């Protein structure tokens, strides 16, 4: 496989975000509070799909079987329930779990059937439940907020929901995240900043209230950490983390494998973006 340059990867990822926003705009959701939820959820669903496939293909037990197939997800469809659970047991805890019926290929192939919007929403909720222990956010009241919710119900005209769901599938089907999984903080922080900027005024709120620009966060992290390259077992806690940019910069400066980060925030919007930021940087 030809590995794209960093510039091409960045441009393609930004184009994915823009295509999703184009679809939400075409269905009358541009600038609404629901737009950022739809775009970030579909962006993250595609990330989950490709991350799971990437890690599954590198598994020592099942990887060779998946790699020998022209399309890994087609081969994955043939797995028994026992084989699926066995594969899950070998994957790192940070890797999202997806059953064969959750994959993009499976969904895309079903998009021509009736009531596809219901299938898409049910699939997202099923993935959220399956991965709740790893990716759900816990509120101060100890309630869990799952990573995915229904997205097509934001379209008030029920007759247009299937069309909307199919358009979202077309947006994400042509992109592949696999080329970016070897990238680190510098790449993902730029993508996250672009994604965040697009929803700065979404739903009447301003993410700028919760956001430290990446350049400033990097300077702050360098000042806090200094040139100490021997830090180990460091704990970083931000009680008002916003979207987590400073925490990401600190983890990068210290070393992602040499620190643990903890965060919270009062804002539901910023907490959702914080979770996305953590997942993209493999720090969930």
Short names for language-model regions:
Residues 206-284:
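Conserved S-adenosyl-L-methionine
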